[in-house]
Regions:
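Active-site neighborhoods and metal-handling regions in enzymes and metal-associated proteins
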Residues: 1-124
């Protein structure tokens, strides 16, 4: 965010940040990629924002910047230890703007480790 965010914008930023955290918390070997998407998507739906989350939640990163496993509602791919994926839910309001919160994470034997270290608070 550049500039001062009104309360409504701050709520959206908090909602997308929390959705992203919930998606990360699902990550571990053996989980379907679609479950990560569902964790993000269901939280945003509870906040009334489902119609504004119009893309998948993430993807693998390896030899290509965008590759399998694809993290979206239709993915049947199973997450594996040592894969690197992004978790990047976003909400886009026509005529207002959008918010996307993204981390790149390593799938570990017990869950995940964030590889990105950007702060989650707004940049003013």
């Amino acid at each position: 965010m550049v500039g001062d965010a009104d309360e409504s914008s701050q709520d959206i930023i908090r909602s997308v940040t929390e959705a992203q955290q919930r998606g990360c918390e699902v990550i571990r070997p053996g989980v379907k990629a679609s479950e990560v998407d569902e964790a993000c998507r269901s939280y945003l739906a509870d906040k009334g924002l489902a119609d504004y989350f119009v893309h998948g939640t993430g993807h693998g990163v390896g030899l290509e910047i965008h590759e399998a496993p694809w993290i979206n509602s239709k993915s049947s791919e199973i997450l594996k230890e040592d894969q690197v994926v992004t978790v990047e839910p976003g909400v886009y309001l026509p005529g207002v703007g959008g918010v996307r919160v993204e981390d790149t994470v390593l799938i570990t034997s017990s869950g995940f480790r964030r590889l990105s270290s950007a702060p989650k608070d707004s940049i003013v």
